[in-house]
Amino acid sequence: MAPEPSLTYLSQASSCNGATDNRKLVILDLNGTLLCRALAVRSEKSVYEASRNPIPRPGLHNFLKYIFANFSVMVFSSSKPHNVQAMLSAIMNEEQKKALIACWTRVDMKLTKHQFDRKVQTYKNLDTVWEKIHHDSTGKPVSWSQYNTIIVDDSKTKCAAHPYNHIAVSDFVAKSHSNIPKDIELACVIRYLKHLKSVPNVSYYIYKFPFKILADKSLEDNLKYLDELDENYKKECQVDNPQP
């Protein structure tokens, strides 16, 4: 059964107020979020080969360039360590890989040996991230929390304990490098992150104004929609926190 948000978490997500500085942590999933591993047959060897040569989601280069320039970044993947390293080498340059403040894999999910080697449902516990990681991309101390942490992932179930820190993107599926579907999600995530960058409580923002792609609408229309969400957020926070 998927974990549920704690009462404390839900309470803290209900207020516009939160962190005292603007530093934010972006946690990245890999497969299905930033890339696709096209597999005809699933085996240890085929998964590794697909990890070495994944199909990048459209807009990935610009997305990575933006987040590394503006946020502290870590990876949290349910894949095995050697596959995670293969995917990172395929999509990130050396500077970006070195800039990661952490890279968590299946090893960090507290699985039994039986579970580790099988395709079982896994969960990404952000409480563990907040307990163990206490520095930003420059090495300075910071208290990461629900106020300043954003996870970009295609699985709502894996992020069920912290739904209002989750930018839920659709599962990216592509058949081959020559057959990549049109996809605007990462471009839209950049716009959403630009709005989240300076808010004091990202969990309030995501709770009240969750990320959403308008189906069958253009990139321009979707960016306009996300800007309208931000305007609505600003109006609500002015009501919650009237200026003297």
From Swiss-Prot:
This is Uncharacterized FCP1 homology domain-containing protein C1271.03c. GO terms for biological process: signaling. It holds the Pfam family NIF. Gene3D superfamilies: HAD superfamily/HAD-like. GO terms for molecular function: phosphoprotein phosphatase activity. One of its GO terms (cellular component) is nucleolus. InterPro entries: FCP1_dom (IPR004274), HAD-like_sf (IPR036412), HAD_sf (IPR023214), TIM50 (IPR050365). It comes from the Eukaryota. It comes from Schizosaccharomyces pombe (strain 972 / ATCC 24843) (Fission yeast). Residues 19-196 form the FCP1 homology domain. The lineage of its organism: Eukaryota, Fungi, Dikarya, Ascomycota, Taphrinomycotina.
